[in-house]
Amino acid sequence: MMQSSISSGEAVVRLSRPQVMVAACKSRFRVLVAGRRTGKSFLCRFILYQKARQNPATVCWYVAPTYRMARQIMWKELKEHVPTHEIQKKDETDLRIELVNGSIIALRGADNPDSLRGVGLDLAVLDEVQDIDPDTWLAVLRPALADRMGRALFCGTPKGFNWFY
């Protein structure tokens, strides 16, 4: 497997060639379909942090099928990935990190779509998207990206013929 090294703050992050292709893609809406244990969540974390770090005052969300899954999949690793000196505030209850540049990275669950309303987003990363109700994307998250021309990354694993197929 070919790997590339990319700077992520102070650390150098090693991404595989497919991960680099997804991270570097300029499309507004990106889709990553890959098997289990292929580094999808690692890539999600990298993309969230890069967007927030490089673009002051942006709002970036990581959305998993449930709030509990968001915490289990991403929270510990995200806190370890973001350098301490770049963190203005960390909210363990709301699963939210505010960077010194004013950007916000927050983890959310798609199991309560009404709790996702009312916020404009610059980036939405939907992980395990095959298990998220398509109406949550269409009626809630997609409109949240509209006024800011926000981007989205859909990541998931094949799971039959569903909206992610």
Language model features: what each stretch is:
Residues 1-165:
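Phosphate/NTP-binding elements of NTP-utilizing enzymes
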